[in-house]
């Protein structure tokens, strides 16, 4: 039976997925592996990254788990070097790492309401900019180097509809009538930034074999 993977075969390609052990990152990693790519599962949680990679390997796929803090240029460069040392190339980058208030234990522990702007802490704002925006810049800057050397590559930035429109807090109401804060200010701001970054790079690499999408 013909499957979608027959149209999108990735044998011989190497993909890096940042946030690869996260809710979305795990699925991106699995799908790329099923399509035939060797997958580098890069995540700030080293154990989780290794577990995802081990699961893929147990299924017969090529995968490697690597610890990556996208805000640390040295760790970003080390991840690229590890990828090249293990697989010899780097063809695909999926920028999936991001802070999301639903899964941010620090924010939850501090009792921060995701949608409340008036008292949103500056330190969490700065942290989100560092991870969600600067991290995408740093990882892309490092990964595009081997792509340029190879003459082709694909960069995929995970964005959101909230990068185009802010969440209307009025529609997020529980059955008991209590309004629930949904997505903090940084989420829309950083996702809009990622979209702008994608447009810039798509135009910048126009005419080359480097493709940039969101």
Which residues does each predicted region cover?
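Residue(s) in the substrate-gating loop at a strand-loop-helix junction
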Residues: 160
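The beta1-alpha1 cofactor-binding region of Rossmann-like NAD(H)/NADP(H)-dependent oxidoreductases
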Residues: 46-47, 67-79, 122
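Conserved glycine-rich Rossmann-like NAD(P)H-binding loop of the short-chain dehydrogenase/reductase
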Residues: 37-51
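A short, exposed helix-loop element centered on a Lys and neighboring polar residues
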Residues: 140-141, 199
């Amino acid at each position: 039976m013909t499957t979608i993977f027959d149209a999108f075969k990735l044998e011989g390609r190497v993909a890096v997925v940042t946030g690869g052990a996260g809710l979305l990152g795990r699925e991106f990693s699995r799908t790329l592996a099923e399509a035939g790519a060797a997958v580098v599962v890069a995540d700030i949680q080293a154990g989780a990254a290794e577990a995802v990679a081990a699961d893929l390997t147990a299924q017969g796929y090529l995968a490697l788990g690597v610890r990556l803090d996208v805000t640390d240029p040295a760790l970003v460069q080390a991840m690229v070097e590890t990828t090249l040392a293990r697989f010899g190339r780097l063809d695909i980058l999926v920028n999936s790492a991001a802070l999301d208030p639903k899964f941010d234990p620090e924010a939850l522990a501090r009792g921060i309401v995701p949608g409340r702007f008036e008292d949103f802490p500056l330190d969490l704002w700065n942290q989100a900019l560092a991870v969600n925006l600067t991290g995408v810049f740093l990882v892309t800057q490092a990964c595009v180097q081997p792509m340029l050397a190879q003459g082709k590559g694909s960069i995929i930035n995970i964005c959101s509809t909230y990068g185009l429109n802010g969440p209307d807090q009025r529609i997020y109401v529980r059955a008991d009538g209590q309004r629930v804060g949904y997505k903090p200010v940084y989420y829309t701001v950083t996702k809009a930034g990622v979209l702008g970054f994608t447009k810039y790079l798509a135009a910048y690499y126009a005419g080359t074999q480097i493709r940039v999408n969101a």
